[in-house]
């Protein structure tokens, strides 16, 4: 049972990786560009709010 499970998992992983790599090479550029733009806007807003809170706390503590 253990040998059969390990073998099946290794085969499924290899097939999944091969299919993913072939598709990712072609579609990865457009997807990463769209994702990076969306994530950058979200991260900038979150980072600015978080940084302001952090700096305000640090400034109050330091002063």
Swiss-Prot record:
Disulfide bonds: none annotated. Coiled coil: none annotated. One of its GO terms (cellular component) is nucleosome. It is found in: Nucleus; Chromosome. It comes from the Eukaryota. Testis. The keyword DNA-binding applies. Residues 1-63 are annotated as: Disordered. The keyword Transport does not apply. GO terms for molecular function: DNA binding. Belongs to the protamine P1 family. Protamines substitute for histones in the chromatin of sperm during the haploid phase of spermatogenesis. They compact sperm DNA into a highly condensed, stable and inactive complex. This is Sperm protamine P1.
């Amino acid at each position: 049972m253990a040998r059969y499970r390990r073998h099946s998992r290794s085969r499924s992983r290899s097939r999944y990786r091969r299919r993913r790599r072939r598709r990712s090479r072609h579609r990865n550029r457009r997807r990463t560009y769209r994702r990076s733009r969306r994530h950058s806007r979200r991260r900038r807003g979150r980072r600015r709010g978080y940084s302001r809170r952090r700096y305000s706390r640090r400034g109050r503590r330091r002063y």
